[in-house]
Amino acid sequence: MKTLFVFAVGIMLSMRASAFTCPECRPELCGDPGYCEYGTTKDACDCCPVCFQGPGGYCGGPEDVFGICADGFACVPLVGERDSQDPEIVGTCVKIP
C-alpha cells in the first residue's frame, strides 16, 4: 500500500508540471471497481466508475485523482500538507461527527 501511495504521489507531482487533460472516454477500457462499500462515482475524467472512499481512504489531489469521500466523510489533509484549502492537497477520509 505504501508503494502504491508513493507511486501515486509521483504521478500527482508530474501532473502539477503539466495541465491535467483527459483522454477520450472509452468505457470499454474501464476496469470493474468491484464491490464498493460506500457506492460508486466517476473518475477524474468523468468516464470510469470508481469507489467512493470511506474512513482512512485516500482522497483529493488534482481533479480528486486520489479519490472522493463518500457522503458523511470529509477529506482531511495528511500531516505535513500545506494550505488545507488548496484543492490539490492529498488527504484521508474522516467521518463527519
Curated annotation (Swiss-Prot):
Keywords: Disulfide bond, Glycoprotein, Immunity, Innate immunity, Secreted, Signal. It is found in: Secreted. It comes from the Eukaryota. GO terms for biological process: innate immune response; regulation of cell growth; regulation of signal transduction. Residues 1-19 form the signal peptide. Expressed in hemocytes. Glycans are attached at T21. GO terms for molecular function: insulin-like growth factor binding. One of its GO terms (cellular component) is extracellular region. Residues 20-96 form the IGFBP N-terminal domain. Disulfide bonds join C22-C45, C25-C47, C30-C48, C36-C51, C59-C75, C69-C93. Does not reveal bactericidal activities against E.coli and S.aureus. PANTHER family: CYSTEINE-RICH MOTOR NEURON 1 PROTEIN-LIKE, INSULIN-LIKE GROWTH FACTOR BINDING PROTEIN-RELATED. Has a role in the innate immune system. This is Single insulin-like growth factor-binding domain protein-1.
